[in-house]
Amino acid sequence: RQEQVLINLLKNAVEACQERPYPEVRVNAFRREGVPVITVSDNGYGIVPEAMDKVFVPFFTTKQGGSGIGLSVCRQIMNRHGGSISVISEEEKGTTFTLQFPQTRVL
């Protein structure tokens, strides 16, 4: 199930930057103080500030035709496995999602 989180974030990142002249999606994996971390970043148009506190709310979406359940399911999966998901974004510059996993579980 944790693989589903990564797949969803990658899909979202690709969609977010597809209209950029030079789309870029980056994935980094590392340990922060012994905790496994994966980040998924894109250079899309970012998330507007007024939407930042809603991105993990079920059925909230800013995408045409989106269901709004993807990121809420991602958070549920990460929480269920003792991990976490967070997001930072800057309009016109892009978005980074950070996954932190329990020390005993890695993808």
At which residue positions do the language-model features occur?
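Short alpha-helical Gxxx[C/S/T] motif in the catalytic ATP-binding
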Residues: 70, 74
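Short beta-strand/loop element within the Bergerat-fold HATPase_c
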Residues: 22-34
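Short helix N-cap motif at coil->helix boundaries in the Bergerat
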Residues: 46-54
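Acidic ATP/Mg2+-coordinating residue in the GHKL
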Residues: 42
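A short beta-strand-to-loop motif within the catalytic HATPase_c
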Residues: 63, 87-91, 101
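Short helix-loop "hinge" at the ATP-lid/N-box region of the Bergerat-fold HATPase_c
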Residues: 12-14
